[in-house]
Amino acid sequence: VTDLAHLPADITPQGFIDAIREAMAGETVPATASAQKAVLVLDGDGGGSWTMGFVGGKLQIDEGLAAAPPVRLTSTVDSWRALVVGRIRERMAEAVGKVAFDPRALARVFHDGARVEKINAFAGDLRLILEDTEAGAEYAVTVTLGGGEPNLAAPTTTVRITMADAVALARREDNLQAAFFAGKIRIEGDFNLPMGIMGAMMS
């Protein structure tokens, strides 16, 4: 079984998807789980697209794009690699100890069908950018809601935070509200989209 906390540095996106399939093979989901699909798109060398959702009480991941998915994540292979085996993972591990990508946590979002329906009420592109000033790099993912095609050139809302401030949040040295009012979380564009999503996730 692949250890998601110690993935090989040269793992490919497809190898990562295979590791998630393996980790989730024995997991079952409640009857309240949503039948909606989510899509992951990684652009760049070795990238691809995958559709994931629950079928027969199990997580199923297929290559390709589902039509009009309610949630679509678009990123680059470089940003993904920073998250699972690179800079983001290293800094978070320093902050909170052992770090592993937990597919169960992501899957739990879809366990509550009613919550997914609330998220379905939103439409637009939410771009999240992590600024790594020490490395002179930025890592980004765009979350597209509502089933439309992503507008990567002009997202509805962009949220920015530095790596140092993200680490402080992970350590619980700061909280989201305080970080926002201190200007550490910067929102450009439609303020209502991220606030509405946060409200739906917490309800």
Regions found by a protein language model. Name each.
Residues V1-S203:
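Feature captures hydrophobic
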